[in-house]
Amino acid sequence: MRAELAVYFIAGTQDIVRGTLPGVLEEALKAGITCFQYREKGAGSLQTASERKEMALECQQLCTKYQVPFIINDDVALALEIGADGIHVGQNDEEIRQVIASCAGKMKIGLSVHSVSEAEEAERLGAVDYIGVGPIFPTISKADAESVSGTAILEEIRRAGIKLPIVGIGGINETNSAEVLTAGADGVSVISAITRSDDCYSVIKQLKNPGYPS
């Protein structure tokens, strides 16, 4: 799981400023993302279940083509219906124990955490496969984001002895990803670093290899 978190792309139709979500996703897959989370939330997102399912299936087919895990954000029913590779939920989404009861053994389970105590609880549950930690930096992509924690939270979680794979979340781009990895994350998640980029190939190369020339 740790390798799959290296460059973890998150997006829904609401995040796309040019082209279409499948088009942007395929470019990112070609460029080397290692995981994709379909997150359809907020202003500009698809509103009906049928629209979301159709888009999820199209994105899933692309991920299958490029052999990259396809994860759905906060929609257990859809994830189970289409056989997603994983489900990711936040602290205020579907209750994690219910998610585990429905999904454990069928797909990977990811949980967002914002403190050492939440990370410890995720590890105690025994069925969470990885945690998303953040927001590390200020973000424009999530209107409901928690307060910024900085990279210190990653160091604190690792010092607490938590062994779960970690992906850093929030405001991460090719200029600051090295700080996130150095602090203890196994990978970085990005939204706007890819969706708003004119050259996602260069961005993804730098995310995978901090120090790669821009």
Swiss-Prot record:
Cellular component per GO, a single term: cytoplasm
Catalytic activity: 2-[(2R,5Z)-2-carboxy-4-methylthiazol-5(2H)-ylidene]ethyl phosphate + 4-amino-2-methyl-5-(diphosphooxymethyl)pyrimidine + 2 H(+) = thiamine phosphate + CO2 + diphosphate; 2-(2-carboxy-4-methylthiazol-5-yl)ethyl phosphate + 4-amino-2-methyl-5-(diphosphooxymethyl)pyrimidine + 2 H(+) = thiamine phosphate + CO2 + diphosphate; 4-methyl-5-(2-phosphooxyethyl)-thiazole + 4-amino-2-methyl-5-(diphosphooxymethyl)pyrimidine + H(+) = thiamine phosphate + diphosphate
Pathway of action: Cofactor biosynthesis; thiamine diphosphate biosynthesis; thiamine phosphate from 4-amino-2-methyl-5-diphosphomethylpyrimidine and 4-methyl-5-(2-phosphoethyl)-thiazole: step 1/1
Cysteines joined through disulfide linkages: none
Cofactor: Mg(2+)
Binding of 4-amino-2-methyl-5-(diphosphooxymethyl)pyrimidine, residues: Q37, Y38, R39, E40, K41, N73, S112, K142
E.C. designation(s): 2.5.1.3
GO molecular function: magnesium ion binding; thiamine-phosphate diphosphorylase activity
Cofactor note (record): Binds 1 Mg(2+) ion per subunit.
One GO BP annotation of this record: thiamine diphosphate biosynthetic process
Entries under CDD domains matching the protein: TMP_TenI (cd00564)
Domain of life of the source: Bacteria
Protein role: Condenses 4-methyl-5-(beta-hydroxyethyl)thiazole monophosphate (THZ-P) and 2-methyl-4-amino-5-hydroxymethyl pyrimidine pyrophosphate (HMP-PP) to form thiamine monophosphate (TMP).
The protein's name in its UniProt record: Thiamine-phosphate synthase
Organism: Listeria monocytogenes serotype 4b (strain F2365)
Lineage of producing organism: Bacteria, Bacillati, Bacillota, Bacilli, Bacillales
